[in-house]
Amino acid sequence: MAEVRTARSVWTGSVTEGGGKVTAVTSGTFTDLDVTLPTRSGAAEGNTSPEELIAAAHASCYSMALSAGLTRAGTPPDSLDVSASVTFDMVDGAPTVTTSVLSVSGSVPGVTADQFAEAAETAKNGCPISRALAGVEISLESVSLA
């Protein structure tokens, strides 16, 4: 059965002077995160952005995909540390998410650096958020701490 997760954004005012509030409706884990255009395209000043939320989704989804793959192979990780950096840029005059750079380090007993890199790449390609971002260049840096 398909799972549906819902977030809501309420925006007031013009795009340049107004602002929005983003809430996780399904889980309720965050409410009223501030978003504005000036902080989206400049200094964050305590506000989030759609791109930061995409980065959070990508990092968390990828860590689950990598953990699942390693566990299926009989080598569950002791720990994984994943970050995703999403780039928002102008392409042909249109604002566009252009890249998501994943960086992962992990401690996985019994796994060589080459095996870790292979598992990391497999997870990058199989992660549902990676697949959702199919039009975005996704790169990966992996480091085995074992």
Task: Give a label for each model feature.
Residues M1-A56, S63-A146:
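Extended beta-strand/beta-hairpin segments
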